């Protein structure tokens, strides 16, 4: 058995190492100067594959060679070669009609020291196979058609060029911003979700003074829902991989609607505290408006929709649209964290482990299943290289690189963190906070799980720096958060109740959010007859309270010792209720 497990682990490690060796492409620079003197040299972005040949990291170590414009030819056969070949030159040829290998093989055979393939379309990695890589010894890269025109317009037809690939900083300062946003969202969302859940349990029967004050009910996630959700995620990811240009607009539309809803949900509690705008719109028969919402809430809804629409229209403005996307994304994550509830640690473990395997499969295993050898997850998250729309999925936090680098010219200015890397561990953090409140543990679970999330995110950044490629963050976040939560439960000897959520049945002290005395639902009473404690057998048949939970079955001590019974809503009765222990109907046990 041990040998079989070791063999399986060895195979997984081998697969991981093979994947790590498959470098699809890297960005580099071509520095161009005029051979006859003139304007100062300029850098242009190229996309190259280091498996053909490596480029020097410093321009001072690169060789300046003549750049020959041969774009009138596709360089797919020997007939396309010039009579004297490309001796000690870097030819520029057009893309198309044959493979990259055929072009670079002909160029190398004619004496070229490098090859630049001009593309009118989006730049794609110049790929090949291992045998072809071993045969070729010169660098091959793709240059955009627009840059090729600028080169010969600016420097004339006789130019010299050097190819190099400057090193980027191991970590960019934008990682600090992403870390603060991610950990802050998880901490605030988890704290809000836990506090809101307990508040709603205490205020279960409260009557709001207006329809706009009604909050969305939390949704408990069941194992069946978890399985359905994962199947839907897999299906959607595969569909996006094959039909990206069509479905990307569907995802953008869904994000606009969901983020506007999330922003409204986050700002509504603040707006309700304002002392003005409480007037309601006139009576009408329009959908939703017939409930006569307050003017301030209506203005808030219009503001949230406007912010979402502005982002949707200007989403490709790299200078500032990322700020709106991050704000809307954080609001969306907070809304989801307080709306979706995992009722037990068992449900948390199931969801996190299934999505952990999902992340590993679509990042590390799918390259062996696709024809291009690319990861489905990475392709979808960053946008397929052959996408005609060049749209990006908005379900990420994105921050532009802050370190100065020549590679800023290339189309890779942002660092990304997916919403799933916030929401999935955040649901566990929210559960920990709810459990903390229920068992009165000074929020040790919440604090420990939040710190574990931060540590897992730091480990993700370290792995990103070491491997220099995108990482599945759940690979590091799930073990950190699950192991930490489990360790705290073991240390406190509460693993059983933490696993099943049975700690929610404990009796809680009076909540600061307890409803106003006269607002709670009351059992029907005869206003003409003074009420007195009665045994459960004398409970009227029409009472909406269960026999074992009837207020009339309480002892005189529970109702306030010696307090005379009054009509519903009377001050004396309300005072007695306030002194009593919470009724089992309002205790957070049944739905935990």
Curated annotation (Swiss-Prot):
Cross-referenced Pfam families: PA (PF02225), Peptidase_A22B (PF04258)
Assigned EC number: 3.4.23.-
EC class of the enzyme, as a word: hydrolase
UniProt motif PAL: location: 472-474
Biased composition (Polar residues): 580-592
Comment field on protein domains: The PAL motif is required for normal active site conformation. The catalytic domains embedded in the membrane are in the opposite orientation to that of the presenilin protein family; therefore, it is predicted to cleave type II-oriented substrate peptides like the prototypic protease SPP.
Protein name as annotated: Signal peptide peptidase-like 2B
Species of provenance: Homo sapiens (Human)
This protein's encoding gene: SPPL2B
């Amino acid at each position: 058995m041990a040998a079989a497990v070791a063999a399986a682990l060895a195979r997984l490690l081998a697969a991981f190492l093979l994947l790590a060796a498959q470098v699809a492409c890297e960005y580099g620079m071509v520095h161009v100067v005029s051979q006859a003197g003139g304007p100062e040299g300029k850098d242009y972005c190229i996309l190259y594959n280091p498996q053909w040949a490596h480029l020097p990291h410093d321009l001072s170590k690169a060789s300046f060679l003549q750049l020959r414009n041969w774009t009138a030819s596709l360089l797919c056969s020997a007939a396309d070669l010039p009579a004297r070949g490309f001796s000690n030159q870097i030819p520029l040829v057009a893309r198309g009609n044959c493979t990259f290998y055929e072009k670079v093989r002909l160029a190398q055979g004619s004496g070229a020291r490098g090859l630049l393939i001009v593309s009118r379309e989006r730049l794609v990695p110049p790929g090949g196979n291992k045998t072809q890589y071993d045969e070729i010894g010169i660098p091959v890269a793709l240059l955009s058609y627009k840059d090729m025109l600028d080169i010969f317009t600016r420097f004339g037809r006789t130019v010299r060029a050097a190819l190099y690939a400057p090193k980027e900083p191991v970590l960019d300062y934008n990682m600090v911003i992403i870390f603060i946003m991610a950990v802050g969202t998880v901490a605030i969302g988890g704290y809000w979700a836990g506090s809101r859940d307990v508040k709603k349990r205490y205020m279960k029967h409260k009557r709001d003074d207006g329809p706009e004050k009604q909050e969305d009910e939390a949704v408990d996630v069941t194992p069946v829902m978890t399985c359905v959700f994962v199947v839907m995620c897999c299906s959607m990811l595969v569909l996006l991989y094959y039909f990206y240009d069509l479905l990307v607009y569907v995802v953008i539309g869904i994000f606009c609607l969901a983020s506007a809803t999330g922003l409204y949900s986050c700002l509504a509690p603040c707006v309700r505290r304002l002392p003005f705008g409480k007037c309601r719109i006139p009576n009408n028969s329009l959908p939703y408006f017939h409930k006569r919402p307050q003017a301030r809430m209506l203005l808030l809804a219009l503001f949230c929709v406007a912010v979402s629409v502005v982002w949707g229209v200007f989403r490709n403005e790299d200078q500032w649209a990322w700020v709106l996307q991050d704000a809307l994304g954080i609001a969306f994550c907070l809304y989801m964290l307080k709306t979706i509830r995992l009722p037990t640690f068992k449900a948390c473990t199931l969801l996190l482990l299934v999505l952990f395997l999902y992340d590993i499969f679509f990042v590390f295993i799918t390259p062996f299943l696709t024809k291009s050898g690319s990861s489905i997850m990475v392709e979808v998250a960053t946008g397929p290289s052959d996408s005609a729309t060049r749209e990006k999925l908005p379900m990420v936090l994105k921050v532009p690189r802050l370190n100065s680098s020549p590679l800023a010219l290339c189309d890779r200015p942002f660092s990304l963190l997916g919403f799933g890397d916030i929401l999935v561990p955040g649901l566990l953090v929210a559960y920990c906070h709810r459990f903390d409140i229920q068992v009165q543990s000074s929020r040790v679970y919440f604090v420990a799980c939040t710190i574990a999330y931060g540590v897992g995110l730091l480990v993700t950044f370290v792995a990103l720096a070491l491997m220099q490629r995108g990482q599945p963050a759940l690979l590091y976040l799930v073990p950190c958060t699950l192991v930490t939560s489990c360790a705290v439960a073991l240390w406190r000897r509460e693993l059983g109740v933490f696993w099943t959520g049975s700690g929610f049945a404990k009796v809680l002290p009076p909540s600061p959010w307890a409803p106003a005395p006269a607002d709670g639902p009351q059992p029907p009473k005869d206003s003409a007859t003074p009420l007195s404690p009665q045994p459960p057998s004398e409970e009227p048949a029409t009472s909406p309270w269960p026999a074992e939970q009837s207020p009339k079955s309480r002892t005189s001590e529970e109702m306030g010792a010696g307090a005379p019974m009054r009509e519903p809503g009377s001050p004396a009765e309300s005072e007695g209720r306030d002194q009593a222990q919470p009724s089992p109907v309002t205790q957070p046990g049944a739905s935990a």
